[in-house]
From Swiss-Prot:
This is Small ribosomal subunit protein uS11c. It is found in: Plastid, Chloroplast. It comes from the Eukaryota. The keyword Membrane does not apply. The lineage of its organism: Eukaryota, Viridiplantae, Streptophyta, Embryophyta, Marchantiophyta. One of its GO terms (cellular component) is chloroplast. Signal peptide: none annotated. One of its GO terms (molecular function) is structural constituent of ribosome. The keyword Thylakoid does not apply. Keywords: Chloroplast, Plastid, Ribonucleoprotein, Ribosomal protein, RNA-binding, rRNA-binding. Belongs to the universal ribosomal protein uS11 family. GO terms for biological process: translation. It holds the Pfam family Ribosomal_S11. Part of the 30S ribosomal subunit.
Length: 130
């Protein structure tokens, strides 16, 4: 199960943030949640791997939910009330991470999907035969 939450030291000490941007990057192997201020400087981050999940458990929706809760816990202490959410990637944890953010009580001004879509670029990986 996940490790106990370790405190990520803030670069500029305890600062008040009324508004910020939450970036969710959901790949097939891991989910990374990064919280920045409006200028783009990272305030806190968390990932399924940093929460103590290993191997295939990192790619589960529950691991993404835990990562989102850990990243947001620091924000609520700093007084963040409003945030924008940018979701990127096709992974299984994208919806669960968003649901965890909604439950935290932060008002979401908008949710934007910024997944890069190719206009017929690189060839995708082959389908797995199990």
């Amino acid at each position: 199960m996940p490790k106990s939450v370790k405190k990520i030291n803030l670069r500029k000490g305890k600062r008040r943030l009324p508004k910020g941007v939450i970036h969710i990057q959901a790949s097939f192997n891991n989910t990374i949640v990064t919280v920045t201020d409006i200028r783009g400087q990272v305030v806190s981050w968390s990932s399924a791997g940093a929460c103590g999940f290993k191997g295939t458990k990192k790619s589960t929706p529950f691991a993404a939910q835990t990562a989102a809760e850990n990243a947001i816990r620091i924000l609520i202490d700093q007084g963040m009330k409003q945030a924008e959410v940018m979701i990127s990637g096709p992974g299984p944890g994208r919806d669960t991470a968003l649901r965890a953010i909604r439950r935290s009580g932060i008002i979401l001004s908008f949710v934007r999907d910024v997944t890069p879509m190719p206009h017929n670029g690189c060839r995708p990986p082959r389908k797995r035969r199990v």
